Swiss-Prot record:
GO terms for cellular component: cytoplasm; nucleus. Interacts with DMPK; may enhance its kinase activity. It comes from Mus musculus. This is Heat shock protein beta-2. It comes from the Eukaryota.
Length: 182
């Protein structure tokens, strides 16, 4: 028993963690959430927290991400529970919102694992990329949101007046002018 450790005691049996040792834990990451998964109770399994609803219909939403557009805001939800907060990066480039995460190779009970993903959203034309905010919940759900109406939908044209600068005097002409004027 000294060589075997149980990392978590939930549920209360030691065999729970090792009930099916040949099966890898859930490998989905960087994918969106369904609305029913946001408010469902969670299971504490291994080293991460997952919504219960994800276990039932896992194949139905593979590759999907939750995206909400309302009158007042743009909102996206992403499950990044396999990553620590310092491994997740959110940035905007022009009208693109890019979420990326990467963690180095780690040892788990099945061997070694490393993960990396990048998801890019196109922001609506009326969302100002400088006003995007990100919040990470305790169970690894990344909430990205920005108010809508921050930019004008119409293209504004600003015509800039071009002023003409006088040409610099020619050095030869300056010498001629100096000789003529006594």
């Amino acid at each position: 028993m000294s060589g075997r450790t149980v990392p978590h005691a939930h549920p209360a049996t030691a065999e729970y963690e090792f009930a099916n040792p040949s099966r890898l834990g859930e490998q989905r990451f960087g994918e969106g959430l369904l609305p029913e998964e946001i408010l469902t109770p969670t299971l504490y399994h291994g080293y991460y927290v997952r919504p219960r609803a994800a276990r039932a219909g896992e194949g139905a939403r593979a590759g999907a991400s939750e995206l909400r557009l309302s009158e007042g805001k743009f909102q996206a939800f992403l499950d990044v529970s396999h990553f620590t907060p310092d491994e997740v990066t959110v940035r905007t480039v022009d009208n693109l919102l890019e979420v990326s995460a990467r963690h180095p190779q780690r040892l788990d009970r099945h061997g070694f694992v490393s993960r990396e993903f990048c998801r890019t959203y196109v922001l609506p034309a009326d969302v100002d990329p400088w006003r995007v905010r990100a919040a990470l919940s305790h169970d690894g759900i990344l909430n990205l949101e920005a108010p809508r109406g921050g930019r004008h939908l119409d293209t504004e044209v600003n015509e800039v007046y071009i002023s003409l600068l006088p040409a610099p005097p020619d050095p030869e002409e300056e010498e001629e002018i100096a000789r003529v004027e006594p």
